[in-house]
Amino acid sequence: EVNEQLVRAVTQAVVAQLMASGAQPQDVSSTPAPEGAGSFAGKTRMRPKHSYENAVRAQKGTDPKEIVIGVGAAFQTEITKTMSGIPLEEVLRNIKAGIEEEGMTSRVVKVLDTSDVGFMGLEAAKLSGSGIGIGLQSKGTTVIHQKDLYPLSNLELFPQAPLMDLDTYRKIGRNAAK
């Protein structure tokens, strides 16, 4: 059984053995990183965190021809490309084009409560005038959802984000609009 006492005893034994061998603690903050890797020494976040504190909450739509696309908080702020390197603005453009090809309209909302694609899709569907929504994670995973289904009982899930291309995203938009 592993417990706190055992962890402390092992830690003390390792430290005692290191001290007995003459090993001295070293400051690794200035140690050069392995070739090809960047050093994090003295670095802070690349960009400051984005605050949505004063953001206006999305309202439920009334247009029966509306499909809402729900994206996560990090979408195009912290993360700008899918896992396969496709720019998120292109992904959105293609999903919207697919929706428009079927004669429907689209609206994009940020879902700030969750990063789970199923819940993002459900929230988008609840905000949509048609009751159909698309959840889109920054990594590219996509789901088509309907407002009266359970969160994980979506209409369609596209988990193969690394294999998806822009044509696939366009087809997802078309499929959601049918």
Model-derived segments and spans:
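Conserved mixed alpha/beta catalytic, RNA-binding, or beta-rich assembly cores of soluble enzyme
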Residues: G38-K178
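Protein-protein interaction and targeting regions used for scaffolding, dimerization, and localization
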Residues: E1-P48
